[in-house]
Amino acid sequence: MRIFLAGATGAIGRRVALLLRQAGHDVTGTTRTADKSPRLRELGVTPAVVDVFDADALAEAVAVARPEIVIHQLTDLTSAPGTPGYPAAQEANRRIRIEGTRNLMRAAQRAGTRRAIAQSIAFIYPPGEIMRTEDDPLDLAAEGVRQWTVQGIIELEQRVLTTAGIDGIVLRYGYFYGPDTWYDQPPKSPSVHVDAAAHAAVIAVSTGGGVYNVAEDCEIVSSARAKRELGFDPAFRMSR
C-alpha cells in the first residue's frame, strides 16, 4: 500500500518506516530538514522535506504521494521532563498536535486517503490508582503544563477520529523507552518499548478502528483492547 508517514525521522518514526518497508509498503516519509533525507532513502523511503505548519506545502506533498494510509508520528519534544526547556517543548508539542494534525488531516482528506493512524498518549487519564480503559474520560481538570498536553491531545484525537471519509485510529502510547528515547528502562507506568509501539502502528495499517491504549501490563492502564483487536504484543522487539 501507499503510505504517507509524517514524522519519519523520530525515534518511533524510523522504526515504523523500517517495518513498513519490510512489509513491502510504498512509503513516503516527512522530514523538516533536507539533511535527514539520506537516512530515509537508506530505508527505502521516499523523502518529503516539508514543514507541517505550511499547509499548502504539506497538501502538495501528500497529493504527490497519493497515500491510501496516513500515519501521524509528529512530535516536537526537544527537552525531557524536569529540564528547564520542558515547558517550552510542551507548548511546541501542543502546537504540532493542533495545527500540524489539522493540516495533515485536511491534506489527507483532499488526497483521498481512507485511513489515518495517529500517535497519542496513555498517560492522559486523571491521576489515581485505578485501571483506565479507552472509555474513561481524559484529565480535563489538568492544570499548568499538563493542561497544554491535554488540550493538544483532545484536538488531535478529535481531528483524526472525525475527519469525514477517513477511518481514524488513535494509539495512546505509554512512556517510550528503549534506543533513541530518554529512557533505557521503563520510567514509570504506563510504559511501552519503542519497538512495540512502532509495531502497533504497522499492525493498525490493516486492522482495527477507534482508540487503543498501547502499553505494557500495569495497574493503571489496560491495553486489553489493543491486544484483542490489533494483536498488540508489548514484548515485540526489532532485530538489531
Feature locations, PLM:
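Conserved glycine-rich Rossmann-like NAD(P)H-binding loop of the short-chain dehydrogenase/reductase
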Residues: H25-R32
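C-terminal amphipathic/interface module of NAD(P)-dependent oxidoreductases
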Residues: T46, V50, A55, I220-R240
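Conserved Rossmann-fold NAD(P)-dependent oxidoreductase catalytic core, especially the SDR/UDP-sugar
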Residues: P81-G144
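Conserved beta-loop-beta element that borders a ligand/cofactor-binding pocket
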Residues: R115, Q119-F123, E155-P179
